[in-house]
Amino acid sequence: MAEVQVLVLDGRGHLLGRLAAIVAKQVLLGRKVVVVRCEGINISGNFYRNKLKYLAFLRKRMNTSPSRGPYHFRAPSRIFWRTVRGMLPHKTKRGQAALDRLKVFDGIPPPYDKKKRMVVPAALKVVRLKPTRKFAYLGRLAHEVGWKYQAVTATLEEKRKEKAKIHYRKKKQLVRLRKQAEKNVEKKIDKYTEVLKTHGLLV
């Protein structure tokens, strides 16, 4: 069986429900999906209203034994995961298998920091929300309802960005050196280039 290509999505700047709906569909179709930077996901509506909604959800519990559920996740990645779960038939084998194909992370941990990350235009806030509309960040909401790792995630993200800057500078320098080297040997290999062109090996 062919290896299923992993779809790596950058959650920053996407709307929670719209992104969750698209991810839910993809995992049901058999794609493996990884969503990074879940703390940067947006929720439409002002922050205060969203916080009140989440605090109301925190009050939902089993009176006789709260440890039996419902479970209230505090991390942005788990809040997003639960949103996707609500859009899947997760109590069936098919739904459970689909949910197993989804991975969610706060920040961008290795090896995904070295991979190309994609966006979903249909779920982007700048595309779907009017500029005047209010919105909230999932990371801030999570922090105010009990997520303890906002500062840790922010520090790790800063370190990752610094590393990425250094890597990009080196890459640019290598490209520049390669171009310079090609220019330097261009005249020396002219006669060989002509021979290769006559044989149709170079266009």
From Swiss-Prot:
Keywords: Acetylation, Citrullination, Cytoplasm, Phosphoprotein, Ribonucleoprotein, Ribosomal protein, Translation regulation. Phosphorylation at Ser-77 upon interferon-gamma treatment in macrophages involves a DAPK1-DAPK3 kinase cascade and is causing release from the ribosome, association with the GAIT complex and subsequent involvement in transcript-selective translation inhibition. Citrullinated by PADI4. One of its GO terms (biological process) is negative regulation of translation. It is found in: Cytoplasm. CDD domains: Ribosomal_L13. NCBIfam families: L13_A_E (TIGR01077). Component of the 60S ribosome. Component of the GAIT complex. Interacts with EIF4G1. The modification N6-acetyllysine is found at residue 191. GO terms for cellular component: cytosolic large ribosomal subunit; GAIT complex. It comes from the Eukaryota. Associated with ribosomes but is not required for canonical ribosome function and has extra-ribosomal functions. Component of the GAIT (gamma interferon-activated inhibitor of translation) complex which mediates interferon-gamma-induced transcript-selective translation inhibition in inflammation processes. Upon interferon-gamma activation and subsequent phosphorylation dissociates from the ribosome and assembles into the GAIT complex which binds to stem loop-containing GAIT elements in the 3'-UTR of diverse inflammatory mRNAs (such as ceruplasmin) and suppresses their translation. It holds the Pfam family Ribosomal_L13. Its main location: cytoplasm. It comes from Pongo abelii (Sumatran orangutan). SUPFAM superfamilies: Ribosomal protein L13. Transmembrane segments: none annotated. The modification N-acetylalanine is found at residue 2. GO terms for molecular function: mRNA binding; structural constituent of ribosome. The keyword Isomerase does not apply. The modification Phosphoserine is found at residue 77. The modification Citrulline is found at residues 59, 140. Coiled coil: none annotated. This is Large ribosomal subunit protein uL13. Belongs to the universal ribosomal protein uL13 family.
